[in-house]
Swiss-Prot record:
It holds the Pfam family Sod_Fe_N. It is an enzyme of class 1 (oxidoreductase). Present in all tissues examined (leaf, petiole, root, latex, callus) with young leaves showing the highest levels in intact plants. GO terms for molecular function: manganese ion binding; superoxide dismutase activity. Its EC number is 1.15.1.1. It comes from the Eukaryota. Mn(2+) binds at residues 55, 103, 192, 196. The lineage of its organism: Eukaryota, Viridiplantae, Streptophyta, Embryophyta, Tracheophyta. Its main location: mitochondrion. This is Superoxide dismutase [Mn], mitochondrial. The keyword Transmembrane does not apply. One of its GO terms (cellular component) is mitochondrial matrix.
Length: 233
């Protein structure tokens, strides 16, 4: 029992457990690659079809494969009472589980132009952006600057802080999910700034990728999440 407490209650936040499936170890499940709601080439010219296919079929799938493997190993370690193995597996679970969580959000954050990609946010989210950042243009400038300045690999997020009841911009390193920055943060938009997200098309010019991704940003999805999480706005 103490070992289970070590894994499920002390080492990882409850929101991360829920997002990554750690709360369901006793009935171990496997995760699979989600289908995209659009064709690989549907985001061109902002993001090439080649990048989308590799990003989805190879990179995201690899995170899922390794995540399922790590969860199976964790389940075995818990059953055996192997505390050293449990501790050793935490980094693999965080990295690969985070990769799965982050990419599952990322695909929903994008939409072809013909399906509303790039259309400006309206309603309560639009008003919140103006209130918390001054304007949409200032928010985009801030997120682009944070994404360009992020050393190595990671993500830049527009989030709702449910405790403060305001929008914030956060960055996370590697595949850390947003919940690692705080359990009250809800991701509205996440931009992948790993090189695999842009290098084939934009080479090492990350700012160009950040500038163009807004042309296919799915603000409708972000607005729906915001309205659900902050219904009084």
């Amino acid at each position: 029992m103490a070992l289970r407490s070590l894994v499920t209650r002390k080492n990882l936040p409850s929101a991360f457990k829920a997002a990554t499936g750690l709360g369901q170890l006793r009935g171990l499940q496997t995760f699979s690659l989600p289908d995209l709601p659009y064709d690989y080439g549907a985001l061109e010219p902002a993001i090439s079809g080649e990048i989308m296919q590799l990003h989805h079929q190879k990179h995201h799938q690899t995170y899922i494969t390794n995540y399922n493997k790590a969860l199976e190993q964790l389940n075995d370690a818990i059953e055996k009472g192997d505390s050293a193995a449990v501790v050793k597996l935490q980094s693999a679970i965080k990295f690969n589980g985070g990769g799965h969580v982050n990419h599952s959000i990322f695909w929903k954050n994008l939409a072809p132009v013909r399906e509303g990609g790039g259309e400006l946010p309206h309603g309560s989210l639009g008003w919140a952006i103006d209130a918390d950042f001054g304007s949409l243009e200032k928010l985009i400038q801030l997120m682009n600057a944070e994404g360009a300045a992020l050393q190595g690999s990671g993500w830049v997020w527009l989030a709702l802080d449910k405790e403060l009841k305001k929008l914030v911009v956060e960055t996370t390193a590697n595949q850390d999910p947003l919940v690692t920055k705080g359990p009250t943060l809800v991701p509205l938009l996440g931009i992948d700034v790993w090189e695999h997200a842009y290098y084939l098309q934009y080479k090492n010019v990350r700012p160009d990728y950040l500038k163009n991704i807004w042309k296919v940003m799915n603000w409708k999805y972000a607005s729906e999440v915001y309205a659900k999480e902050c219904p009084s706005s």
